[in-house]
Curated annotation (Swiss-Prot):
Entry's cofactor comment: Binds 2 divalent metal cations per subunit.
Lineage, top ranks: Eukaryota, Metazoa, Cnidaria, Anthozoa, Hexacorallia
GO biological process: catabolic process
Entry's EC annotation: 3.1.-.-
Source taxon at top rank: Eukaryota
Protein name: Phosphotriesterase-related protein
GO molecular function: hydrolase activity; zinc ion binding
Residues annotated to bind a divalent metal cation 1: H24, H26, E170, D299
Cofactor(s) for this UniProt protein: a divalent metal cation
Binding site for a divalent metal cation 2: E170, H202, H231
Keywords for the protein's UniProt record, in alphabetical order: Hydrolase, Metal-binding
Family membership noted in the UniProt record: Belongs to the metallo-dependent hydrolases superfamily. Phosphotriesterase family.
């Protein structure tokens, strides 16, 4: 029985063994379906480069979705990504939730190899990503079929393996929601109700998106208290909206630590906050009394953010962010809640 347990790619785990947890990352994925043409015609020659160098690294930081090589993580052999995850372990990390779902090339067998090589607990996700990444057979499937596929991956195994998912999501949502994305949300809520699994959402890029998503989940029988709303740092810029979101009972996730860029390529109209601003917003929500509902991560989903290529890697929060949080008045007890207690509560099957 999964009730009262967490479920990793290597099997069931006592929740108290989860330790310091990154709640939203990717280790093995193909994000080429989310390619963006660069805004400058003269930069088109950089899109096909199959290497990351000192000469193109800054350009990639501003245009991460315009280079195919950058949009692939965890290529075989797995030594590159194993070394990156091992850095997280070395700095005191224990568990990573891989949010790669149907549409962006999840590979659960590779995740199990990474877990066994690094002794890091890895929890993989079931569910469906954004509309444009999904094939017609998924878009045309009834809710019941979408639900059953997720239930099977949570209780039986993924694609003929005995590797089971331990979370639903990240469930992809655009703004405005498309019909398949609404159907995916409804199916995710139904799968959560049936299995007791934790749920995590990728909201559309609008401050009203989380509110609409929560309403749909509630109407479909989802448990908001066991749901993470991802990407707060690129979605909500009004602190009153931030409090409204936390008041719904969901977990509020800042998951783009390390991503500091002048232009956020997926939404050029928004101003991506710095890590310092993320910490300030977290401190604000802590002071509002929501320390039990905050989780954090990096959402690494492009190669240039790995240490090998001059990026911050999976240990950035452990090495750089936690000390800065302490300097800004966040207590060690609050940090332990954010990194250990809150993820543990969320990841424990009901």
């Amino acid at each position: 029985m999964t009730s009262g347990m967490a479920q990793t790619v290597c099997g069931l785990l006592q929740p108290q063994k989860l330790g310091r947890t990154l709640t939203h990352e990717h280790m093995v994925m193909d994000y080429k379906s989310c390619y963006f043409k660069p805004s400058r015609e003269q930069d088109l020659h950089l899109c096909s480069k199959k290497e990351i160098t000192m000469q193109n690294l800054y350009w990639l930081r501003q245009n991460p979705y315009s280079n195919a090589f950058n949009l692939s993580l965890g290529d075989e052999p797995l030594e590159e990504i194993i070394a990156e995850v091992a850095e997280f372990k070395k700095e005191g990390g224990s568990t990573i939730v891989d949010n790669t779902t149907y549409g962006i090339m999840r590979n659960v067998e590779a995740l199990k190899k990474i877990s066994m090589a690094t002794d890091v607990n890895i929890i993989c996700g079931t569910g469906y990503y954004l509309d444009h990444t999904l094939p017609p057979e998924i878009k045309n499937a009834p809710i019941e079929e979408l639900t059953q596929k997720m239930v099977n991956e949570l209780t039986v195994g993924v694609e003929g393996t005995n590797i089971k998912c331990g979370v639903i999501g990240e469930v992809g949502c655009s703004w405005p929601l498309t019909p398949i994305e609404k159907k995916s949300l409804q199916a995710s809520a139904a799968a959560q109700a049936e299995t007791g699994a934790p749920l995590i959402i990728h909201p559309g890029r609008d401050e009203s998106a989380p509110e609409e998503i929560i309403r749909i989940l509630q109407e479909a029988g989802g448990d908001i208290s066991r749901t993470v709303m991802s990407h707060t740092d690129r979605t909500i810029f009004n602190r009153s909206k931030l409090v409204e979101l936390a008041a719904t009972g969901c977990y509020v996730e800042w998951d783009l630590f390390g991503m500091e860029t002048l232009f956020y390529q997926a939404n050029l109209a928004s101003d991506m906050p710095s890590d310092s601003q993320r910490i300030q917003d977290i401190k604000f929500l802590l002071d509002e009394g929501y320390e039990d509902k905050i989780v954090i991560a990096h959402d690494i989903h492009t190669r240039h953010r790995l240490k090998k290529y001059g990026g911050h890697g999976y240990a950035h929060i452990m090495v750089d962010i936690v000390p800065k949080m302490l300097m800004r008045g966040v207590t060690q007890e609050q940090i332990d809640k954010i990194q250990i207690a809150n993820p543990r509560t969320w990841l424990t099957f009901k």
